[in-house]
Amino acid sequence: MGEIYSPSQSKGFNQPYGYPMNCNLSRVFMEMTEEDRKCLEERKYWCFLLSSITTFCASMILVVIWRVVTHLCCQRREKEFVEPIPAPEAVQINMNGSKHAPSETDPFLKQQEEKHLGWMTEAKDWAGELISGQSLTGRFLVLLVFILSIGSLIIYFYDASFQNFQVETCIPWQDSPSQQIDLGFNIFFLVYFFIRFIAASDKVWFLLEMYSWIDFFTIPPSFVAIYLQRNWLGFRFLRALRLMTVPDILQYLNILKTSSSIRLTQLVTIFVAVCLTGAGLVHLLENSGDFFKGFINPHRITYADSVYFVLVTMSTVGYGDIYCTTLCGRLFMIFFILFGLAMFASYVPEIADLIGNRQKYGGEYKGEHGKKHIVVCGHITYDSVSHFLQDFLHEDRDDVDVEVVFLHRVVPDLELEGLFKRHFTKVEFFTGTVMDSLDLSRVKIGDADACLVLANKYSTNPDAEDAANIMRVISIKNYSSDIRVIVQLMQYHNKAYLLNIPSWDWKRGDDVICLAELKLGFIAQSCLAPGFSTMMANLFAMRSFKTSQTTPDWLNLYLCGAGMEMYTDTLSHSFVGMTFPEAVDLLFNRLGLLLLAIELKDEENKECNIAINPGPHIVIQPQTQGFFIAQSADEVKRAFFWCKQCHDDIKDVSLIKKCKCKNLALFRRNTKHSTAARARATDVLQQFQPQAPAGPMGHLGQQVQLRMINQQSSTSDTHLNTKSLRFAYEIKKLMPSSGGRRNSMSIPPDGRGVDFSKDFEQQFQDMKYDSTGMFHWCPSRNLEDCVLERHQAAMTVLNGHVVVCLFADQDSPLIGLRNFIMPLRSSNFHYHELKHVVIVGDLEYLRKEWKTLYNLPKISILNGSPLSRADLRAVNINLCDMCVIISARVPNTEDTTLADKEAILASLNIKAMQFDDTLGFFPMRHQTGDRSPLGSPISMQKKGAKFGTNVPMITELVNDSNVQFLDQDDDDDPDTELYLTQPFACGTAFAISVLDSLMSTTYFNDSALTLIRTLVTGGATPELELILAEGAGLRGGYSTPETLSNRDRCRIAQISLQDNPYDGVVHNTTYGAMFTIALRRYGQLCIGLYRLHDQDNPDSMKRYVITNPPAELRIKNTDYVYVLEQFDPGLEYEPGKRHF
């Protein structure tokens, strides 16, 4: 150890250094000057310290005295001006009825109160407004105080870090620029202190605040330094505590907006402020020495080393290279460690956690210039995200240059995080919620191309899930009304709430995917054409097809169709002037594309309508948008590039690319002669009419004209026969009323010229349609009138009907059975073609659903159990056209494999049943005429299934993996994807998960969802959506030409080739030849086959779906053909027969 200086030594400090030389020196300092030694002989630190303590004590005493005097004066004033209780006769009643006692002291009291409250209140309000962060002046003042505090702290750092610094210096004030600047800062701090003092409601607590102590220990010493002509380093380091106001200042400036950023800033500033303050006190105590020893043991240490020492000590590392040697310093460190260790252990991990999370999923989205992005929110899990990304980023999509931004409040788990990392070039994730506008701004929702809201399909409370998604849409639309929103909803009746959002606009691209509506619609269409649900599900899902020689033939054919998708593109100029069948034939046979529909532009209403297989009366116009079925988007480009001049002789369709010839004149010529093409289309239509029952509304007008002639020829007879009455009734429906269009059921249209009896009106009561003409309608019926007992059902001749096995109880949420029944009641079917629907389930649950079903005809209910074989036999399940197994119960969330236990048990129960070898007959048509290709609705006798395995059935599943339990004889791997399993390929199973692909399909092509909804729902229109949104259900209306014209629309059908429906089509005919014959002669558009799985087993009824087979495929006489056919107005209802 070096020598220690003591007062007994020479006065001139004989030591070469003013302090001892030892191993704990932090650095080498310059030799003290003679002036520094003389200055330190007589220390004046106590003057600076005493000024701070005196200022505080004086301020506190003055505040206490003021409070005591004010309290005494108030008590005395209250005693002097106590109002005497007035006598009863002195009490007066004023005009408003209240009582008061007149007193001469009233004005004086009021004046005293105003004086007392006047200047004090005004001064307090003025000071409070001046320092408030709500005003611009207050924000500026707070920011200025912080800047000057940091400036004062920087001056302290300079003074404490100077090489030959001393705790006390005798430099005169006028010779020290740092003291002069610091004094100016302290004058401003003094003014700010008085403003805060005036604004404080409690003066005592104000004096005890931390920032007040900072002012007490920094402002008075700067004035004392002028008087003493010396400076003391003192407690100026306390200005570092002003750093804790940084979060408030940044919030005033709207820089900090999220709770995590605010908390992170608070933790960092508190930690830094405490470290700097503690280091300042260690620096002061060590460099001063112990005061009770006469400051003979100072420890020279710089401020930077003090900060290092404090951090190392707080972290409990303690290297020992620097330590405290003075007793005061050690005592301080004992207490500082207790506080600092607790703060270090709690603050540092939280800071690290906030910084780590912020770096991962915080911040803002920074997209590339010119690159689109979408925001996906709602139910974000591994399953929902993986299904979405698998379809959205599929390789078959044409140049998907869109980034996907996921926004969710929960940090992704490891599985989901790994999925994001695999798609890191296309996907980003941010923590937050769309309910917060700050989070919406972080993901740049205003610049996004669309926002997609996903729903939890397995939610135990569907209505609550829909309400949450609707609130998300409201928040998004409130932030940016122009953003396109695509939202998933569980229940159909919740769609109405979206219409209440002012900025919700279907024309702008906003759309809702109702899972219950589409799920039940798919199942309903499978009742009309078994397997159609599988075909449509494969069409809007992106799947790749790869052939393999080891794969069975049936699976290759199925996978070839499963790889097909629905695309849209513009037809080239070479198609302009062609009729729709001509364009379809050319595209299929020459280009290998299947054209399903086109977009028709309504110039008057400036709207576009989708026409599905519209028939030969529609002519292709320039820039017509087509809806295609193809393997990829590149294949669809052939329709856009095809040129008759350049590509007419090309056999290899892969060579059809953009040609270099200039066809502008040809394009104009095609446009010019579009009128001539329409005339040619009329000739083609007349050529098609004798053979094809389907036709446009012009055909229907011809039928009406013939009926009017028949009616005129029969009016001379006194008694009308039944056929004449039927013709007259059709005339009554078609003729417009004198008062215009009427849809009200309360006022019958007049002016018909024919008198009908009440019995006749009652007889045709069940033939009415709803007000839009899109669905069959009947007057509301009581539930009890449609309930069948078991013995009643057994005695009823049920054949060709639909049996719905519904698992539900009284507390089950509504699934919207109307969405299942309405497609089966579409008006493009005649009344006698409607399949009777028998629901087997709980009556109390159906009572809740009945208010949406009582206007739909041909519905019966059997109050029983779908697992009861007696109930199933009573409804003739062996003679039904389709058995549907669905469940309304809340799925099991603990074990997903048990979610479908009832549906699986019901399916296996039916398959294990055996039936008598009975025959069921459909009503035979007595009129002669050509046989319709539809076959079954006109003339067919159906043999009942002898075994339950032959009963046509479709089962709804919640969990995809449970499909392995439906077929016990298949060889599907339990890990096989749903679309690769036999039950799904055969159309006997349907899961709601297949609808996940609709989100990306709708985003890339907003018209695709309209096309799918039109095919699936039977023709739901926006007008009908508004009617149902009112909550009153379907409304009936009298038939008018406008409403009846809505019947003329396309429908799905399944035709058996065993009935030889097409002339010239026999066994082993190519599919392409059958396609052309069906299209040209019958106006039917073939879209697929339903083929037997085992051709060698005559007892096997299992079939699989082939979507859009290749033209060279050979058909078999056992195949069923999926066709899109037009409405046939020639099939009329015969009142003399009963139909189910």
From Swiss-Prot:
Membrane topology: Multi-pass membrane protein
Intramembrane segments: 300-322
Species this chain originates from: Caenorhabditis elegans
Residues reported in the UniProt entry to bind Ca(2+): Q964, D967, D970, D972
Protein name (database record): Calcium-activated potassium channel slo-1
Cytoplasmic side: 66-139, 200-203, 250-264, 353-1140
Domain notes: The S4 segment, which is characterized by a series of positively charged amino acids at every third position, is part of the voltage-sensor. The pore-forming domain (also referred as P region) is imbedded into the membrane, and forms the selectivity filter of the pore. It contains the signature sequence of potassium channels that displays selectivity to potassium.
The gene coding this protein: slo-1
Tissue specificity field: Expressed in synaptic regions of the nervous system including in both the nerve ring and nerve cords, as well as in the body-wall and vulval muscle. Expressed broadly in motor neurons. Forms puncta at presynaptic terminals of neurons, muscle excitation sites, and in the dorsal nerve cord.
Annotated spans, Segment S7: 520-540
Domain RCK N-terminal: 371-514, 799-953
PTM annotation: Phosphorylated.
Family membership: Belongs to the potassium channel family. Calcium-activated (TC 1.A.1.3) subfamily. Slo sub-subfamily.
